[in-house]
Amino acid sequence: MVKTAQLLQTLNDQLSELAALVAPLAEHATLSPRFDRQLFHTRSTLMQAYLAEAQHNFNQLRQAVERQQLPQVVWIAERLAAQIAALRRETATWSLRSWDHASPTLSRWQRRRLQHQEYERRLLAMRDQRQRQLAQATSLDEQQRLGKEVEAYSGRLARCRQALDKIENVLARLTR
């Protein structure tokens, strides 16, 4: 039972780590579902939905362990491990995926959306990095410089999000 508890804890830790990796991409949509139905039941185009399904499977695994349903435990554990591996691969290769095929006008706007989502992710990462550096800065000059950089990144992020909202509105009109 101790070994099972350790394995559950390891899976829980992996899911927590994965949630942190997926967080910047969680609400970013793709043109089509990312995984086949054998691996994930959800047909969503949002990464958050796939992560939520993996979390749900982890909860089912925990319940199956408590009820000592060995065949279910084995099946759910294998499925969950495959889901975690697939989500890790997807987050690692996200920036390489520029777009999926669709109609020319629609695909151009969807490509723009994906581009802006990537800009947003990178701006968030840069702003967060500068905020961490600012928290650790010791000299006044360094604090002022980093403070200005954080403000600049926040402004860029706000403009990027405004552009994303406009793109989403155009896409909503095109797909009605």
UniProtKB/Swiss-Prot annotation:
InterPro entries: PriB/PriC_sf, Primosomal_replicat_PriB/PriC
Gene3D superfamilies: 1.20.1270.340
Any Pfam family: PriC
Keywords from the named record: DNA replication, DNA-binding, Primosome
Keyword DNA-binding: yes
Keyword match DNA-binding: yes
Functional note: Involved in the restart of stalled replication forks, which reloads the DnaB replicative helicase on sites other than the origin of replication. Recognizes abandoned replication forks and remodels DNA single-stranded binding protein (SSB) on ssDNA to uncover a loading site for DnaB. There are several restart pathways, the PriA-PriC pathway is a minor restart pathway. Part of the minor PriC-Rep pathway for restart of stalled replication forks, which has a different substrate specificity than PriA. Part of the major restart pathway with PriA, PriB, DnaB, DnaT and DnaG primase.
Family (UniProt): Belongs to the PriC family.
Subunit structure, as described in the record: Component of the replication restart primosome, which is composed of PriA, PriB, PriC, DnaB and DnaT; DnaG primase associates transiently with this complex. Interacts with the C-terminus of SSB; this interaction is required to load the main replicative helicase onto substrate replication forks. Interacts with helicase DnaB alone and in the DnaB-DnaC complex, probably 1:1 binding with DnaB. Interacts with DnaT.
Protein name per Swiss-Prot or TrEMBL: Replication restart protein PriC
Gene source species: Klebsiella pneumoniae subsp. pneumoniae (strain ATCC 700721 / MGH 78578)
